[in-house]
């Protein structure tokens, strides 16, 4: 049986994650995805999650926490896996991890084009 697996991003996932972001139209000319990933890895890499299905990355979430509020960026689910509960499963995991670090509120950033 095929199973979705949520795990922490590692640099070996970089190419697949950027490909996912491109599929989901999350990359804009003013945002270099490699620089965004590098910045995230310098701060709190345990709050950068991916979803794998048959060893292929089909979801991602880059999460920030400043001690007061959580922020969610690059929330993506491969279009072929949308409407299957993957986004909801990922959001539950995000909420769980932020609650564990004492976060009382989450801000989600969504572009009009998304």
Place the predicted regions along the sequence by residue.
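A short helix-loop-beta-strand connector motif used in the catalytic cores of GNAT acetyltransferases and
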Residues: 39-50, 71
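A short beta-loop-alpha structural element at the N-terminal edge
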Residues: 3-16
């Amino acid at each position: 049986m095929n199973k979705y697996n949520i795990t922490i991003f590692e640099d070996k996932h970089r190419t697949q994650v950027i490909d996912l972001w491109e599929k989901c139209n999350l990359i804009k000319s003013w945002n270099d995805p490699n620089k965004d990933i590098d910045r995230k890895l310098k701060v709190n890499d345990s709050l950068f999650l991916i979803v794998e299905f048959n060893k292929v990355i089909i979801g991602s979430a880059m999460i920030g926490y400043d001690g007061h509020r959580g922020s969610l960026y690059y929330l993506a689910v491969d279009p072929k896996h949308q409407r299957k509960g993957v986004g909801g499963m990922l959001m539950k995991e995000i909420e769980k991890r932020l609650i564990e670090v004492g976060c009382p509120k989450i801000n989600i950033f969504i572009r009009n084009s998304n």
